[in-house]
Amino acid sequence: MADATNPPLVYQVPEMRRIRRIHFVGIGGAGMSGIAEVLKNQGYDVSGSDIRDSAVTARLRAMDVDVYIGHRAENTDQADVVVVSSAVAGDNPEVVSARERRVPIVPRAEMLAEIMRYRHGIAVAGTHGKTTTTSLIASVLGEAGLDPTFVIGGKLNSAGTNAQLGGSRYLVAEADESDASFLHLTPVISVVTNIEADHMDTYGGDVEKLKQTFVDFLHNLPFYGVAVMCVDDDYVQEIIPRISRAIITYGIDNPDADYRAENITSDGLKTRFLVRRPGGRPDLQVELKMPGRHNVLNALATIAVATDEGVDDQAICRGLAGFAGVGRRFQVYGEYRTPKAAATLVDDYGHHPTEVEAVIRAAREAWPQRRIVMLYQPHRYTRTRDLYEDFVRVLSEVDGLLLMDVYSAGEPAIPGADGRALCRSIRQRGKVEPVFVEDNREIESLLANVLQDGDLLITQGAGDIGGVAARLAAAGVKASE
């Protein structure tokens, strides 16, 4: 971030009136923990609760945050405000206690909006690519010495955290469309990476309602704000005529994009490309340490934002080239060994068919000669049901497949939308022979039967499969150079 030998003056944000102690219900979540960390570093007394300990709760405790395991009414006794995520039920004992004592209960996004209120907010929305794009923007602004505050849905590897209080007026944050809570935010710059049918229970199954919600989000921009939009995406193109704010576009395929990538080449995990920019600005030759067309688009959004903010071209290129990635976003662990084979282990958070397809494509680009074996954990029964045929099609494109059962995220089971059903449908398609994982403790032995020497093993999904990847890494990985 900023030069430690010459630190900037810390940007002063007015305090929230009458608020001293802030309690988070579900503090271990990626979005909640980041906001809690920023508020703690702003000087507030922060507490929180979660159902289990984790690396996140341990980190918060090390920051002197009071973290309780289990939800109990007395946890909120000292709270002046209680922050909840959309996953927290109204009958949660801490929520009930706060309501009885007339303590304000606010959604996570409303607290993020309060943090953003007095800052120069940059919000990144979209079905896919939010975390990586937010991280890239934060890294480039940091490389330029602008020392932003950031709140990200994954761990920024270079910072070792998913949130950080910066010394400047800049705030970069993800904008969550899953529950439409991004409508609370009032940024100065809004990025829309793409729009796809996901979390459709929030939108009553109506794609038009989903698209209009993105329009409403962009109209939260002030008249001097700007929307940065990917015109390679069909739904994004459809809503552009409805937007009454300044718009900057980017893309690869659309020749009318303001920022356009050309001459894209891959070299292992590196991607190089040329960026055409509007207004007579010189082209940029860019290098990323990440494979995949989707990451080129994420970088284009970053370049558009940074250029509009007046960031020096060299700082843009340095920030992109030096970007060390985000936890669980095509995270290369190293070499995983079984008694008979050695495979490269990659872990990725993607859990939508488009995201899984992008990971497979990126892996093919980076390692074109290797077999791809995927260990996949579906996430949510509703998503599996709504996108069932897309999952069957995409998961049939790997060379070996192990399927875990659905990570429910609190949803009730839906007949015909589980891991076994997916396994049957993929087998009937006839392109790959899937193996259903009956018991997660059997994963290592199943992998020993499936993996061949030189394979690429990808652990994929948004549930607890990240813990499986870490377990495999600890048990059988020789660290990468």
From Swiss-Prot:
Gene Ontology BP terms: cell division; cell wall organization; peptidoglycan biosynthetic process; regulation of cell shape
Cytoplasm recorded as keyword: yes
Primary enzyme class: ligase
Superkingdom per UniProt: Bacteria
Pathway note: Cell wall biogenesis; peptidoglycan biosynthesis
Binding of ATP, residues: 126-132
Keyword list, A-Z: ATP-binding, Cell cycle, Cell division, Cell shape, Cell wall biogenesis/degradation, Cytoplasm, Ligase, Nucleotide-binding, Peptidoglycan synthesis
One GO cellular component term: cytoplasm
Subcellular compartments: Cytoplasm
PANTHER family, sorted: UDP-N-ACETYLMURAMATE--L-ALANINE LIGASE (PTHR43445:SF3), UDP-N-ACETYLMURAMATE--L-ALANINE LIGASE-RELATED (PTHR43445)
Name this polypeptide is given: UDP-N-acetylmuramate--L-alanine ligase
Gene: murC
